[in-house]
């Protein structure tokens, strides 16, 4: 969020980086680094200045104890990204075992975050991966 330009954005990524065995075939658009760069660049194009940007981090929960700690890896990635880019982190609510519901008003930088009760979080796996819309054109 840039409070002077009143420009903000929010990202949600499921994996910080592709697993090693598929790195050469993975779409960059599915992973944290690409998505974070895209967000920062879009904010800059809307008048934000990197020197004024401030970040809040939410998420990184490890929802399934049977899987690798993906949420922890995402939290580590997000912290490192901000540090590398010189964007100060003003708040974080990361990790744990509960999902979060985030509401963000980008023009004013207001955030409301709530933990989602474990019994209301989705437990079923999605049926399939949607096709990436990157590089497609919709005519209307």
Where are these regions (language model features)?
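Local cysteine-cluster metal-coordination motifs and their immediate loop/turn environment
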Residues: 60
């Amino acid at each position: 969020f840039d409070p002077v330009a009143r420009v903000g954005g929010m990202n949600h990524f499921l994996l910080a980086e592709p697993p090693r065995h598929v790195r050469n075939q993975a779409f960059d658009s599915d992973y944290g680094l690409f998505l974070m760069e895209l967000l920062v660049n879009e904010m800059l194009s809307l008048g934000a200045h990197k020197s004024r940007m401030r970040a809040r981090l939410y998420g990184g929960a490890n929802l399934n104890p049977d899987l690798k700690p993906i949420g922890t890896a995402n939290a580590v990635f997000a912290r490192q990204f901000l540090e590398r880019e010189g964007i100060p982190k003003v708040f974080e609510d990361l990790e744990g075992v509960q999902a979060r519901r985030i509401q963000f008003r980008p023009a004013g930088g207001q955030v409301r975050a709530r933990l989602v009760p474990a019994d209301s979080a989705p437990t079923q796996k999605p049926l399939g991966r949607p096709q990436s819309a990157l590089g497609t054109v919709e005519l209307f």
